């Protein structure tokens, strides 16, 4: 297309919504003129499915659960008045608790105020809170956020070293786990508890739980007399929990206006309920994914936010989209191996990294640019006569978009006016709705994650086998190879797992395992001190 034709196409397909300030440009996606008409019946069926979901129909058949994250910002839509009341009560409790912490009503035992918040969680219990904290945080934060988001000992040590003993005395810990049985979160809680104990502090006087009623974590918090407990409901999945206490409590403690955040999500929900496809940005996103991937996950989505505050957005979207869309089976039980791979960093940094391949390498992707119109608070320096650093950032986004388009590389652009609690809420709600609509278009269950459970089960098997191997070494004595240990345990097929586990054990002093390296490495021998 020539410049005039591109301008006409841009005007035809540009969506602007005044209530949210959202602008969506899909003109650089190479769909045909009849694409929307051909997809309209499927899109209307997706709208129908979404209406049933919001009305409380069982939308996660594998777990026989409702899916209610949209109710979190519009409680009046909940199918049960008790659910609506619980949502409102939780937001009020989160707001009140944060105010009490900020005002010194809830205090640290050895400090006047809590000044830090340590969030202990993984997956949806960390990615959303991390994204929001980074996007909206600043020098005016009421509390500094820190995270244990993995079962990596060194990672937790780095956080604790940053806090120091004095900082830990001023740190409120939030443990987030719906089931209370997530091992990574359990490990983080135990590591934190030990750190508080080493500092002469009582963990329970610093601890808050966000969990399901009656869960293992809920019972632990109740028995230990923790400061407070907030609910996680079974109808809210981890990756869609950012507008629940999972996301609201850390944000409120940081000093972020959570009601503005909820208002942005609620306003976007209203917008994305429109059944007029070309006026619904979530529907347009879902259809662009379907067009680009042919409804089969054949292309990756590269997320390029041209804003440092949105650096973590691609990580958040990785879980939201890939855990929802990446499924082996469709709703009819047919093997489809569906998915949509998401990766990205930030612009214009990525122009000096992998944009070279995007323009000239394998064409197996489309780009989702995210643009923020407002550069900063206050005036900017003119780095050249008439131009600021922000002008350059905008120019690089537009230039990259043009350079990709010249090579037939597809892209869409999402524009918001500024980074505020409200617009971040809009972004969260926009992609949540797009995921649900796309899942309907490709006939999959977006709200379960059997692959995650399979990985957890396999990890449990590895740990059990490692325990057997270590016990055998200690019991039998001597120096043995992994092959010999596997044979002695009657598990010759597990020699590789045993070798890898003993390799790790020998590198750490905790298990008292000594390795005598050999060549090839797999013939190394192990003994117990």
From Swiss-Prot:
Keyword Chaperone in annotation: no
Record-level GO cellular component terms: cytosol
Catalytic residue list: 323, 352, 456
Pathway: Carbohydrate biosynthesis; gluconeogenesis; Carbohydrate degradation; glycolysis; D-glyceraldehyde 3-phosphate and glycerone phosphate from D-glucose: step 2/4
Catalytic reaction(s) noted: alpha-D-glucose 6-phosphate = beta-D-fructose 6-phosphate
Protein name from the UniProt record: Glucose-6-phosphate isomerase
Presence of keyword NAD: no
Role summary: Catalyzes the reversible isomerization of glucose-6-phosphate to fructose-6-phosphate.
Pfam families: PGI (PF00342)
A single GO BP: gluconeogenesis
Protein family membership: Belongs to the GPI family.
PROSITE patterns: P_GLUCOSE_ISOMERASE_2, P_GLUCOSE_ISOMERASE_3
EC nos: 5.3.1.9
InterPro entries: G6P_Isomerase (IPR001672), Phosphoglucose_isomerase_CS (IPR018189), SIS_dom_sf (IPR046348), SIS_PGI_1 (IPR035476), SIS_PGI_2 (IPR035482)
Organismal lineage: Bacteria, Pseudomonadati, Thermodesulfobacteriota, Desulfuromonadia, Geobacterales
Organism: Geobacter sulfurreducens (strain ATCC 51573 / DSM 12127 / PCA)
Keywords: Cytoplasm, Gluconeogenesis, Glycolysis, Isomerase
A GO MF label: glucose-6-phosphate isomerase activity
Gene3D superfamilies named among the record's database cross-references: Glucose-6-phosphate isomerase like protein, domain 1
Location in or out of the cell: Cytoplasm
